């Protein structure tokens, strides 16, 4: 048994048993992946996967138990590699934050400024992506901290801390007819072409749920990944925009009017995620504390380092 075999078992569950994707994620060949699985099953004397021909469909009960053990072993191996840095280089290094465009552009600047004043020898790297990509970066060690409104709080292998709650607001050109509608309703918004976030990011599910509850089907003419792109197309006259309320800036006042929609759409929560059970440098803990002053450093460490209490579930 070796670490590569355990990584393959873990990655197979993460990639929905698609061995091509497993090979891509681990920078190896599909034939090599299959060989490692076969050799591990022969060594242990169990079948790890449920198969249909050559295709993997899921995990057997022994396979599920092995996956849980593999996660713990690989996480502890990662901790061993981090141990020397923790004792020799705790106030300098690189803090890698995986986050969405909206948080990187509008929410993080004052926090990062305050962080740099505390840790001038720590360089900050921002990696922008979708919530799914952010979650993957936390799992594979590509990021120390993940920040997003979706996914992070639902993953039992991550420790998630709330940062702040936010709502969507409606961005319209100045003097648009909707500025005269009071109170603003979903029915009124649905009469206009709509521009908003694409599926899976920045609270798009809240928008869809609100319209669905009313039996409305808005004409979403364009969806995008970040607020600045949405603003560009609203300015061009393609439609009205539903954007995160924190995406406002002074420059838009001459072009747009923002309309309050807190009574129409449910609130969203921005979460900060860490890989559960993983040793971190002091400046990682302090960054979380800067974002959530209601938690002490001891409480943050306790929540992040405690083992998950529920079984790992990759839709096994």
Curated annotation (Swiss-Prot):
PANTHER family: HTH-TYPE TRANSCRIPTIONAL REGULATOR (PTHR30126), HTH-TYPE TRANSCRIPTIONAL REGULATOR CYSB-RELATED (PTHR30126:SF6). Pfam families: HTH_1, LysR_substrate. It comes from Klebsiella aerogenes. InterPro entries: LysR_subst-bd (IPR005119), Tscrpt_reg_HTH_LysR (IPR000847), WH-like_DNA-bd_sf (IPR036388), WH_DNA-bd_sf (IPR036390). This is HTH-type transcriptional regulator cbl. GO terms for biological process: cysteine biosynthetic process. Residues 1-59 form the HTH lysR-type domain. Belongs to the LysR transcriptional regulatory family. May be an accessory regulatory protein within the cys regulon. The gene is cbl. Keywords: DNA-binding, Transcription, Transcription regulation. GO terms for molecular function: DNA-binding transcription factor activity; transcription cis-regulatory region binding. Residues 19-38 bind DNA.
